[in-house]
Amino acid sequence: MSPKARRAAGLQGASAALVLTNPPFFEAGKMRLSPNAARAFAHAAPAAAKSDEPFLSRWLHACAALLAPGGRLVVIHRADALAALLAALAGRVGGLRILPVQPRAAEPATRILVAAVKGSRAPLTLLPPLILHEADGRFTALAEDIHRGAALIAL
């Protein structure tokens, strides 16, 4: 999103203390889209624009541009997109904290939460995973507390 487009949308650059984002997880044409137009738009990045820059990189560049110095960016994405996400954030934010989210303890992470700070030079930190379910399918105690608002996700 260009600075002009951000201003037209009422978004002032370098002013946000916190930007939370859930970018589209998939590229258009690489998955079967929902027949619901709003869902399809939310789940798949639009077809390539005039830019050679990947969609995720453009999305996160726009998010980072909204942050004031010291502002925090929090992103949720697919775990298999971690490399692309790190590449997109390189040079824009620092102090990255990565929280893998696993469906169950014995399964690999399917999602990641990434928090970063504009202007930080702190090193990347890989946090212990957030495990959502016990082997029997019940929520873990922490996941249950998070859902009920009794605990926070430590990022």
Q: Where do the PLM segments sit?
A:
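Short, glycine/acidic-enriched loop or turn micro-motifs at the edges of active sites
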Residues: 3, 25, 118
